[in-house]
């Protein structure tokens, strides 16, 4: 394994135009940096023959993530870390070396951040739009994916399982289940229609989280997207849902047009609105785990936000740690049975 690691590190060193790798040693990594995907992730300190040192991240990644990173590296890795893997064939987890961006995730105060993220994301999306035939390693978010996987196994099934296991959860949240199933099914139909439509299909990240999430780093003044473990050939709209409000999404639309994409704004608006529920569904399971045993006043902040998004399609604050004012409002709605009602807060 050690010899293999050196070969992989050398491959990345060549991409980054460094020297010859002399040896590797284990570096320090926090749990937060390692992430919560369950993948094996390490930081290794690299010493080159010229005496220079730097660190690299090693991740045991699935084929689709290794290939996504290879594709983005080959395209110039302007807003993704450079990466290298020896194995770009085996459909099993294999080691990949990744450029270490450090631990600074947020830009300093005063940086106009959203336009930079918009520009970078639009560049990645348009570069890979409608290239499904060239990316045979990338799974497709087709009707089967949405209906039999994302709205069931990934999300609402976890809700139903906890209802079966925890009578307290069932009493408090069980009334939401029929509407959750109904709204998520409508969402799946919309996404399946976008797959058939084809125009918006591209290499998507799928797990960009929100501005206080962990998958967009501030590095050398630019946004860098990391952790492509949830990548799919899917509508680009799902990458906008968690991170951008409608005003920022309009900046993204303008970037699409500047990159030569032909799309009416009314059509863009309709499709991005339909995609908002993606965030509620993709993060429903983590929010249920966070609720744990309750009470909702202490552990239900994330869960109420995800339920609000799925039940109404509204997305008032794009933050994991959203405001206490909004939490109080959602708690009140939850207690008086109006969480499922529209408030007009679609931003």
Locations of regions flagged by a protein language model:
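Active-site ExK catalytic segment of metal-dependent nucleases
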Residues: 55-61, 99-101, 227-229
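Conserved kinase catalytic-core helix
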Residues: 104-143
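Active-site Asp-x-Gly
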Residues: 203, 217-262
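Catalytic-loop of the protein kinase fold
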Residues: 203-206, 210
